[in-house]
Amino acid sequence: RLREQAARDSGTPERAAGLLQGCDAAMRDLYSPLWSSLPAQGPLVIGHIGQSLDGFIATDAGESRFVTGRDNILHMHRMRALCDAVIVGAGTVAADDPQLTTREVPGPNPLRVVLDPRRRLSAQHRVFRDGEAGTLLVQGQGASAADIEGVESLRLTDGEGLDLRALLHALHARGCRRVFVEGGGRTVSAFLEAGLLHRLQVTIAPLLIGSGRPSIRVRGSVSLADCLRARHRVFRMGSDVLFDLDLAERGDGAKPGTDLTGMDRIL
């Protein structure tokens, strides 16, 4: 596995050049931090969320495919191909049954990491049985369900939820230098609250859902001066708009890896 990882890491810009054929200069620039901004310690962690104008990722009935358009779907597949691991929560797997592969673009599949603290997912979901890529099931120490045959399992302390820092350390130890946190809202929010994201991509679709499953939710600010502000870039994704936030130098003075709230765990 580590030898395979080294092969992925060597020549990343060259691999990206083939993957990004047909993309304009602006889109190519969106992906440049994946090889130009690797931290000295630990993996580069990039979060992504696709939402409506009014901040929802799904309807009240749970319908979420697809809030954003085709261009953003291709973008997520490129991100998977350029990263070593893709992380999703159990809610995303239960609602969407995603494959988390790179079937829409030329490029390697990442390690699929599913966070399921209480082991409520069945073995019937595609990430556990399709054999398209490796899957790591992350669950709490207290989860009582049996492991899933053919799926690697990692148990983490779960006094108040999964220890996300320990997860990133484990992924880095196995050679994952780029980690893509793809969803859903609770999972991305947990990484953001803990100060574990280096970048955050928010793709906004031109539609209003009205009510439903919320997008990012973080601790509220008493005043605008206390809000998290970050340098950002804006990219067109067809009819959608993607905001790429650089959290390496946050407006609140914190840097990735700084625990702002103690909430570096996910329920």
What is the meaning of each model-derived region?
Residues 1-267:
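Enzymes that bind and transform nitrogen-containing heteroaromatic metabolites
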